[in-house]
Amino acid sequence: VIRRTSSLRARLVRFAGAAAALAAFAGAFAPAAHAQQTAICYNCPPEWADWASELKAIQDKTGIHVPSDNKNSGQAIAQLIAEQKSPVADVVYLGVSSAFQAKDKGVIQPYKPAHWDDIPAGLKDPQGYWFAIHSGTLGFFVNKDALEGKPVPRSWADLLKPEYKGMVGYLDPSSAFVGYAGAVAVNQALGGSFDNFKPALDWFAKLKANQPIVPKQTAYARVLSGEIPILLDYDFDAYRAKYKDHANVEFVIPAEGTISVPYVMSLVKGAPHEANGKKVLDFVLSDEGQKIWANAYLRPVRANAMTKEAAAKFLPASDYARAKPVDFAKMADKQQAFGEQYLKVMH
């Protein structure tokens, strides 16, 4: 009996010791797990608009880790719709017309972040479903070294010249917002409207003969490598290439005109890390968050974040006068129909 009792006691002591060790082991890992706060963003590509610096600053200042994500606006919305019953993302970054679609599809929810009142009325949804964080002007991002001695194109008409065969790229306008923005820009510049996309469709049909390159996602690196010598893209990508990557590039605002468009963010409906998502949205509108956009050559929605040093690197105001505003609600309304028409013309 005594032996059995002492044996039982020994087993209990060993069990207690193991339990204590297990608790200590778990305890050692608990702070690390707790410290690793996360928020999931759809369409936050590190190569686009210097999201790499913004995501790093978010982690440094808030402790929230936001993984980068290479979806475009259309792909992000498709994923949000597919995951509607069990959302994965917390926040989403979209071209403005895509934000109208996201609201219509019920995949985003209202949130009015810090500095809400600093955002101009036309650059936010009145209920808070989306709000602009910065804007860009569409034009030609040109790698001059890849032009093989040809002149830098200055107009939409120039891009149709046979000498630029195989040199012109644009993102797919049936999927990527920047692609659709390019289509709207050429359409408006050539006399079209949201009720008449014939000028743009005719232009794309003519461009087809020049064998354009049509990626679905951000193509910054492909311009720098010379694979795509001329890309329909925003000013901020060209300025980044010129001033940060020291590439021999030029940004051109076409002679016939172009458009400037905002990019926006939203809180995802049913966000699994909603509190963290809100902190991310607060940060991108903070003084520091907005300054990162300005230093990446975007126009921050809070204009006072634009430094004199950054502003001096933009083309003159006389060039930007050719960039016209458009009705973003109409732009959103016509996006799907244009995408379908475009696919018919190009395939």
Residue locations for each model-derived region?
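Short beta-strand->loop
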Residues: 108-117, 130-131, 157-160, 229-230, ...
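Periplasmic-binding protein-like
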Residues: 50, 118-121, 136, 166-175, 201-206, 212-213, 283-307, ...
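C-terminal capping/gating helix-and-loop segments adjacent to ligand/active sites or protein-protein/ligand interfaces
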Residues: 290-347
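A bilobed periplasmic-binding-protein/Venus flytrap-type ligand-binding module shared by bacterial periplasmic
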Residues: 139-146, 184-189, 261-274, 284, ...
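A ligand-binding cleft/hinge motif common to bilobed small-molecule-binding domains
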Residues: 97-103, 224, 229-248
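Extracytoplasmic ligand-binding site segments that recognize negatively charged/polar headgroups
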Residues: 44-52, 75, 88-227
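Short, polar/charged alpha-helical segment
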Residues: 40, 44-67, 140, 241
